Regions:
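Transmembrane helical cores of multi-pass secondary ion antiporters/exchangers
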Residues: 1-408, 412-415, 479, 483-486, ...
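Residue-level signal for cytosolic alpha-helical hairpin/rod architecture
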Residues: 372-373, 418, 475, 543
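Canonical RING-type zinc finger of E3 ubiquitin-protein ligases
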Residues: 554-563
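Short cysteine-rich clusters marking metal-coordination/redox-active sites
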Residues: 546-549, 562
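Cytosolic C-terminal regulatory domains/tails of membrane transporters and channels
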Residues: 397-525
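Short loop/turn motifs at secondary-structure junctions and domain boundaries
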Residues: 259, 551-553
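Short, positively charged
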Residues: 42-43, 247-248, 459-460, 535-542
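Cys/His-rich, Zn2+-coordinating zinc-finger modules
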Residues: 524-545, 552, 567-610
Length: 610
């Protein structure tokens, strides 16, 4: 019962603190640590001992799996060089660097224990770095590298701590689980069974890898890495989910793992703080002086920060890869500095510290070092990361540019779908094809409207507002029918679910529109010859209006301008689509946005933006 009360209390504190931080715009990971430290000194809060097995077998597999599912395998592969340099090279360097510092300041600890604590504090934490990084809007490439580093560096550190772990064995186990789970998912159509498979996968992959063993000598057995197995399985299953799962299963898995990830991540930060009292009291009750312990903790923290910063700048030119435009430019030094500064440690550091054998000299001091580095990096680097990003003027992902790319990709998908529809609609007595074409075009129009200016309400916003009002009264009527008891509750539940699905789509569209509001879509290099052509600037023939709409007495939504002749016409979201008509009549390939603050272009021939 004591354990149940403790778990309920942890979840309750997590929910309350997260809700308060959301209202006050505060970083919940840092606040949870402070709350945990304060709670550890309250008399009515029970002692919480963080068992290594709980973290390594209970928390680490689902957290890594959830992160791997959301990590793009394409981006991971494109950034594999910096990821490997950080997750392997930096962890090894930090292990020996911190080990040398600890051994120099505390000679009685011995080289084995000194290197062990070096391996313990070496790996940064995926939860800390990406949760704060995404919240403040770090560049996507920086977040991708941090995610990839954090997925692999735990395995590297645990290899350094337990030299029997074999990374290649972990890869093999992960591949086996990907094949087995992928095969099962292709034949499982029920969402609940698919969800159960997803929940089972990280724990099964981790345990299977850790239980397998290959004898390397008479008294030694090598084990595959459970961490690597979970990461490999998660990356591949996440990458292949559009093929392996149906739509309902993908939506359910996405929502389930987001909820699990939120609860576990938040609980991790609270647990870190709750360790404070016992770790501090045990360390200062040893024979070492208070001054020596404090100097050792501060020196280790400084070493961790300095070694990481020095390594990322030293290897900066090794981080170069061809960018999306194929330029191969060296990343800005500001990106490099952020990578160096975003090296917060987390719960794995504390859990690994508890693996150090009890008979190790100065073990309590080593545990305090691990806690001090974890809390210090989270509070020092985590709290200052938003300020550092602002001072360096590092650009956040542009919502308007994202909306432009989203509209372009959706348009390409729609064109492919309409081509398939033409093949299917040979015999169509009920004119179903026309209905489908109209819905697809309206979906495309809505995507393009989100790129437009944020002034008057556009047709999609009007539709969302009106339809949401309708759904409210429709749901009210369904609830009235339910209260009469004349209709089976299964039927009522199905109708309510249908309304919920439609309303959730409207809410998603509105949230996306709010992210774009106030942003500016900037130009980027297109990938067709028409967009790449340098053209002399032309003056618009009718600034601020579509003369065709004026003549016909119709209303336009957004305006476009032909880059060859300067003709202003309305977009395809407008009723008359005069920009497309202009292209059909003149053969002019490229139009650009004529809205204030926008400089993107559209090629009618190749159907791409630039």
């Amino acid at each position: 019962m004591h354990t149940v009360v403790l778990l309920v209390g942890i979840v309750a504190v997590v929910v309350v603190v997260a809700a308060a931080c959301s209202k006050l715009d505060l970083p919940s990971p840092l606040v949870l640590i402070v709350v945990g430290v304060a709670g550890s000194y309250l008399p009515f809060v029970p002692d919480v001992t963080l068992e290594p097995e709980v973290v390594l077998f209970g928390l680490l597999p689902p957290l890594l799996y959830a992160a791997a599912l959301q990590t793009s395998l394409v981006d991971f592969n494109a950034n594999r060089r910096p990821i490997l340099l950080l997750s392997v090279g930096l962890v090894i360097l930090t292990t020996f660097g911190v080990g040398a510092v600890v051994h120099a300041l505390l000679p009685g600890v011995g080289w084995a224990a000194a290197l062990a604590i070096g391996a313990v504090v070496a790996p940064p934490d995926a939860v800390a770095a990406t949760s704060i990084g995404r919240r403040i809007g770090l560049p996507r490439r920086v977040v991708t590298i941090l995610e990839g580093e954090s997925l692999l560096n735990d395995a590297t550190a645990l290899v350094a701590l337990n030299t029997a772990i074999a990374a290649f064995g972990g890869v093999a186990v992960g591949l086996v689980f990907y094949v087995v789970i992928g095969f099962a998912r292709k034949h499982v159509t029920e969402t609940t069974l698919d969800t159960a498979l997803g929940l089972l996968t990280p724990f099964a992959a981790f345990v299977a890898a850790e239980e397998l063993g290959v004898p390397t000598s008479a008294d030694h057995v090598a084990h595959p890495s459970g961490v690597v197995a979970v990461v490999v399985a998660g990356l591949l299953l996440g990458h292949r989910s559009p093929v392996l799962q149906n739509a309902q299963s993908r939506i359910a898995e996405r929502l389930n793992w987001r909820s699990i990830q939120f609860l576990l991540e938040s609980a991790v930060f609270l647990l870190i703080g709750l360790q404070a009292r016992d770790i501090i009291s045990n360390a200062f009750s040893t024979e070492s002086s208070t001054t020596r312990i404090l100097v050792l903790c501060v020196a280790t923290l400084v070493s961790v920060v300095v070694i990481r910063m020095a390594w990322v700048f030293f290897s900066r030119y090794a981080l170069v890869r061809p960018g999306p435009d194929g330029s191969g430019k060296v990343p800005p030094w500001t990106y490099t500095f952020l990578l160096g500064w975003a090296g917060m440690r987390g719960v794995v550091t504390l859990a690994a510290a508890f693996i150090i054998p009890p008979e190790t000299p100065y073990r309590d001091v080593l545990l305090l070092i691990a806690f001090f580095v974890t809390a210090g990096t989270l509070l020092l680097q985590g709290a200052s990361l938003p300020w550092v990003a602002r001072r360096l003027r590092v650009p956040s992902p542009d919502p308007a540019a994202d909306a432009l790319l989203r509209a372009n990709v959706l348009h390409q998908a729609s064109q492919t779908g309409l081509a398939r529809l033409d093949e299917l609609a040979g015999d169509d007595p009920h004119d179903v094809a026309a209905t489908i074409r109209d819905r697809v075009r309206r979906r495309d129009f809505a995507a393009w409207e989100r790129v437009g200016p944020q002034g008057a309400e556009n047709p999609s916003e009007t539709y969302n507002r009106w339809r949401r009002e309708m759904i409210d009264v429709e749901r009210g009527r369904v609830l009235e029918v339910r209260s009469t008891g004349t209709v089976p509750h299964e039927v009522i539940d199905e109708v309510l679910a249908m309304l919920d699905v439609e309303e959730s789509m409207l809410d998603h569209s509105s949230a996306e529109r709010e992210r774009v509001r106030g942003a500016t879509a900037h130009a980027f290099e297109g990938d067709c010859d028409h967009l790449r052509q340098v053209r002399p600037p032309v003056e618009p023939d009718s600034p601020g209006e579509c003369t065709d709409c004026q003549r016909e007495g119709t209303t336009w939504v957004h305006l476009r301008m032909c880059v060859l002749c300067g003709h202003i016409a309305c977009c395809d979201s407008s009723p008359q689509r005069h920009a497309s008509v202009h292209h059909e009549h003149t053969g002019h390939e490229v139009m650009r946005s004529a809205e204030p603050g926008e400089d993107w272009r559209w090629c009618f021939v190749d159907q791409v933006t630039g």
